[in-house]
């Protein structure tokens, strides 16, 4: 009985902080609280019986709850011959909160019917590939980043992905990013990622010669004064405080 009233609370709440608080309450009941598997099923039942407009409003909750049941609903929408339902399903999967849907996104990018679908799905992959996620270890996340890079066809897409790659704080990520310092079109995001990785002193100190060489390259390459300052400080073993 609790879930339908919580769902009604989400739909009644004005956009903004109140709506977000209502959404968090539903997600907590359906993912963490005692009896959450039954609550998640109750939410899916509420979602299925909701109007199209209400389903649209509940999309982010559906994605945040995730799981096989939610993905089944989304896959049914994507497979629908109704173009509006397919678009709705693609929007839902593109909002998924973690990388569990990555293989499905890769598959869907390959089957995209037009550029808009491809852009939506690839954008979702670029967003989730490096996300902190307890369902994928760092090596698998980096593999997903590499797989996503292979799907990118524009430097703007590659730039977004390279900038985000530094969220995977490993030496293997550093080794993946460094060669892009030599590519003029992608040197800027590579500089940013190298510096972000160098921010982590343990990682930097464990591979000092490699980081020193890469930071020298950043200083010689970037036109961003803040990156030059940071790279210089990290080379000297100093810290850097992010400006508030």
Residue map of PLM features:
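Alpha-helical protein-protein interaction modules
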Residues: 124, 184, 190-194, 202-203
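Beta-propeller blade termini and top-face loops
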Residues: 14-34, 38, 48-57, 64, ...
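Short inter-helical turns and helix N-cap capping residues of alpha-solenoid HEAT/ARM repeat scaffolds
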Residues: 14-15, 50-51, 81-82, 113-114, ...
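Core register positions within helices of long alpha-helical scaffolds
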Residues: 9, 25-32, 61-64, 68, ...
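Amphipathic alpha-helical scaffolding segments comprising HEAT/armadillo-like alpha-solenoid repeats
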Residues: 1-12, 33-48, 56, 67-79, ...
